[in-house]
């Protein structure tokens, strides 16, 4: 399954594309940060980010678009920008008939690190391990978008048997968390995510 993750932001919008396989391994396809100038008119900024997201969607043809769920912040202008870009992303996905997954930051952190309060460096470190990258993805918008894609792919994989393909191509000499996960049931991070999901359902 190909997932396109979006870390929404008006100045910097991270977009990460990941292939997730039936053995829960994952492969990096692409990662970009769509940028706009803070001095530009709002409608031009929204159009620029929307065009950037849609260009990547059309290029990579994902099955699912995963977007960070908006949550309250002290900085009203920041949360408004995030909400506006989220709307742009959702419209683009709907226009193409794509499934959408919304995840809170704590859900994503729990999925990839096993800890819902992990900091950005911990998230980036685990994303690099899962994808078998030689360096941490930067900036944080990029690693957050990839983490969203991984989280959505693992959730889809645990909700139905088999995702796209059987096993990711092997990268010689690169150790990753996915290697230990292959064929061995949920990883520790996935198990933590499942526990968090069950706890959330219990509070509803």
UniProtKB/Swiss-Prot annotation:
CDD domains for the chain: RuvC (cd16962)
Organism (species): Clavibacter sepedonicus
Binding, Mg(2+) 1: 7, 141
Protein name: Crossover junction endodeoxyribonuclease RuvC
InterPro entries reported in the protein's UniProt record: RNaseH-like_sf, RNaseH_sf, X-over_junc_endoDNase_Mg_BS, X-over_junc_endoDNase_RuvC
Residue sites binding Mg(2+) 2 per the record: 68
Biological process terms in GO annotation: DNA recombination; DNA repair
Active-site residues from the entry: 7, 68, 141
Keyword Hydrolase: yes
Quaternary structure note: Homodimer which binds Holliday junction (HJ) DNA. The HJ becomes 2-fold symmetrical on binding to RuvC with unstacked arms; it has a different conformation from HJ DNA in complex with RuvA. In the full resolvosome a probable DNA-RuvA(4)-RuvB(12)-RuvC(2) complex forms which resolves the HJ.
Pfam families in UniProt: RuvC (PF02075)
GO cellular component, one term: Holliday junction resolvase complex
């Amino acid at each position: 399954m190909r997932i396109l993750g979006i870390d929404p932001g008006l100045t910097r919008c991270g977009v990460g594309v990941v292939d997730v396989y039936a053995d829960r391994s994952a492969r990096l396809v692409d990662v970009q940060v769509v940028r706009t100038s803070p001095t530009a008119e709002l409608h031009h900024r929204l159009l620029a980010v929307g065009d950037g997201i849609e260009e990547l969607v059309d290029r990579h043809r994902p099955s699912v678009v995963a977007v960070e769920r908006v949550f309250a912040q002290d900085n009203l202008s920041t949360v408004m920008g995030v909400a506006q870009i989220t709307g742009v992303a959702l419209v683009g996905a709907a226009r193409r008939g794509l499934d959408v997954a919304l995840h809170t930051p704590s859900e994503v952190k729990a999925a990839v690190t096993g800890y819902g309060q992990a900091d950005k460096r911990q998230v980036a470190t685990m994303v690099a391990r899962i994808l078998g990258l030689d360096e941490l993805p930067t900036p944080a918008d990029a690693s957050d978008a990839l983490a969203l894609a991984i989280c959505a792919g693992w959730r889809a994989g645990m909700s139905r048997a088999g995702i796209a393909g059987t096993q990711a191509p092997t990268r010689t000499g690169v150790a990753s968390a996915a290697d230990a996960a292959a064929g061995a049931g949920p990883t520790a991070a996935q198990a933590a995510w499942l526990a968090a999901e069950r706890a959330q359902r219990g509070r509803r």
